[in-house]
Every structure is written in C-alpha cells, then in structure tokens.
C-alpha cells in the first residue's frame, strides 16, 4: 500500500478473497471508488505454511476508517482446528472492526447470485460447488483437497497433463503424441523426448510450491484446447465431467428449488471448459459479481450501507474496470 493510503479517513469497507494460490484485498470507499488493492500468496492453511503471516499482513494495511470487512478464506469450515486458527488470526488483526468470515466458495456464491438461489462451481487451484436456496439453506459438494479430491480443478488438470506428458515420453501413450511439442513449448521444455525427460525432472525438483505450479499449467492446457489440440481438449472434457457432477449433486440435494449454475475461479475463465460443462448442465448464469464482490457486498450490509441492485451493478463495473472482474 502506498504511504498516503494510510491517511484515508472517509468511511470505507474491505473484502479479502483468500485462495489456494493468491489472496486479494480490496478496500472500497463509501462513494463506490476503490481506495486500494493488494495481493499476496495463497492463504489456505492446509498447504500454505505462511498463510497466517500473509493474511494478517493484508489486514494490517486496512485504514482506521474501515467500517466492516468481508472475508472468504479457502479451507474455512473444513477443520475445527484450522478454522479456530483462522478465526483467531482475523479477530486479533481486526480488533473492534466488524467482520464476517466464511469459506471462499460461499462468498463467491453470494457474489454470483446476489443472495438468490443457485449453485456456484469454483475451479481454481482446488475445486468445490456451493449451493444456496436463497432462504438460508446451503450445501457443498467437493472441496476435499488435492490428496483425494479437487476434481476438475486447475491442479488436477495440470497433474493430468503432466501424467499424459510422461506417458508420451516413456512410450506408454503413442496416440496422443500431438500433445508433446506444444505443451513442452508452453513449459519451456525441449520437445525431444530424451532431452525433455531430464528437463522435466529438473523443473519438478526446483518447484517451491508444487501444487500452485502444477495448477498454473491448466491455463496452458486451456489455450491448447482452444487451438484444437485434441489431447488437451480431452483433458478439459474430463475436468468438465467432474465439475458437472458437482452441479448435479448439489441440485439433487436441493430438489425443491430451481438452481441455475454459475462459475468462479481462474480455471473457469476458459470458454472451452464452461461450454463443456454447459453441454451437461445447461447454460450458466453470468456471475453478478466476482468473488471479491461477495465480500464487499456482505461488508456493505454489515456497515449499514444500502447495497441495492444499482449498487451491485455499479460495483461490478468498478471491479471490472480495475481488472478484478474474475
């Protein structure tokens, strides 16, 4: 934060969207303008040893005039022990500032539907679906973590791409050789199988945070799929089937209300992936707000503001103009 940002004295609110690979802070003035944006690394306590330092570091940047904060944190509500640690970190940092704390996917669902019924499927480093009936009842599907879950996530797509690459390199897969050269190019690896083998292991051995690095490969798979690379398209179609299963399960759990679906997370910025899910679950509803907007909406209500439909529309434009629309 620039030094002058500490001098902000007009009423403001803030939101934090804490994901597996990155964490975003947005401070919003009462006139609807953005006072500040900050970003740091992931804050999921399940696999980020520095999660507390990163989270409290952002919270310490808040202006003294902050009226309320809305937080959506990856991993929240999934382990009583870690949940207590997250709550402790937030309460210690915020003191008397009112706040709301929930799971990052719950926050994204509120943002997407503005409190109306719907099922939000999130695919970023991890994956999960969150459904709301608009009357206070919620359900979740997935979100079990990378060891035995996160189907359809960027991490799983990246890992499956690496598995495919290794099978091509050692001869177990001969029908998908068209994947070798373009994928190696995106990773900065030689496409010659003998050279690529050692280069890939070198890449692997130097990773500082393997889960995030593997998840980052998903965007390359998406680009290749958009450019008619058949093996890459197959990887995304597999992910789409997994994510569609999340949506169907949520709808089954709430049979008495119609649940349109929407999306959040970097992986689902891929038109190819969204279209593949739509083929199984119907056309998605464009989210009213990006995930961080859900935290700002909650904070605005908690601060006693009046965030009506026009306020939400204005916020969506403001966040989009600031490059925060996804």
Regions found by a protein language model. Give the residues of each.
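ATP-binding/phosphotransfer module of carbohydrate and carboxylate kinases, centering on a glycine-rich
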Residues: 1-67, 112-119, 162-326
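Short glycine-rich anion-binding loops that position phosphate/pyrophosphate groups of nucleotides
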Residues: 21, 74-77, 125-128
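Short beta-strand-loop/turn "lid" adjacent to the catalytic site in phosphate-handling enzymes
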Residues: 39, 44, 60-101, 110-113, ...
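A structural signal for short, well-ordered beta-strand segments
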Residues: 71, 129, 263-265
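Short, active-site-adjacent cap segments at secondary-structure transitions
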Residues: 77-79, 107-109, 128-129, 268-271
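Glycine/charged-rich beta-loop-alpha catalytic/anionic-binding loops adjacent to active sites
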Residues: 90-98, 137-145, 276-283
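Active-site nucleophile and cofactor-binding loops and adjacent substrate-binding regions
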Residues: 99-107, 122-123, 284-293
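Glycine-rich phosphate-binding loop of actin/hexokinase-like ATP-binding domains
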Residues: 116-169
């Amino acid at each position: 934060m620039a030094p002058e940002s500490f001098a902000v004295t007009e009423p403001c609110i803030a939101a934090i969207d804490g994901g597996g690979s990155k964490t975003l802070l947005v401070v919003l003035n009462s006139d609807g303008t953005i006072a500040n944006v900050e970003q740091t690394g992931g804050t999921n306590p399940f696999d980020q040893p520095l999660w507390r330092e990163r989270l409290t570091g952002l919270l310490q940047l808040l202006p003294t005039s902050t009226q309320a904060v809305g937080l959506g944190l990856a991993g929240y509500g999934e382990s009583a022990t870690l949940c207590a640690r997250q709550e402790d970190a937030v309460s210690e940092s915020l003191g008397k500032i009112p706040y709301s704390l929930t799971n990052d996917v719950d926050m994204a669902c509120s943002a997407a539907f503005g409190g109306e019924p719907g099922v939000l499927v999130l695919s970023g480093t991890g994956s999960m679906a969150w459904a709301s009936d608009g009357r206070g009842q919620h359900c979740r599907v997935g979100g079990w973590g990378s060891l035995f879950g996160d189907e359809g996530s960027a991490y799983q797509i990246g890992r499956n791409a690496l598995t495919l690459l290794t099978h091509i390199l050692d001869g177990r897969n001969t029908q998908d050789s068209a994947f070798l050269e373009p994928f190696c190019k995106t990773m900065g690896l030689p496409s010659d199988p003998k050279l690529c083998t050692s280069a890939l292991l070198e890449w692997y051995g130097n990773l500082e945070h393997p889960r995030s690095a593997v998840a980052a490969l998903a965007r390359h798979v998406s680009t290749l799929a958009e450019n008619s690379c058949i093996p890459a398209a197959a990887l995304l179609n597999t992910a789409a089937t997994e994510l569609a299963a999340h949506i169907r399960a949520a709808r089954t759990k709430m049979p008495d209300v119609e649940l349109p679906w929407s999306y959040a997370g970097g992986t689902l910025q891929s038109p190819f992936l969204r279209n593949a899910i739509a083929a199984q679950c119907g056309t998605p509803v464009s989210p009213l707000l990006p995930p961080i907007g859900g935290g700002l909406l909650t904070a605005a209500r908690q601060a006693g503001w009046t965030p009506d439909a026009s306020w939400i529309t204005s916020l969506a434009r403001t966040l989009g103009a600031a490059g925060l629309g996804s």
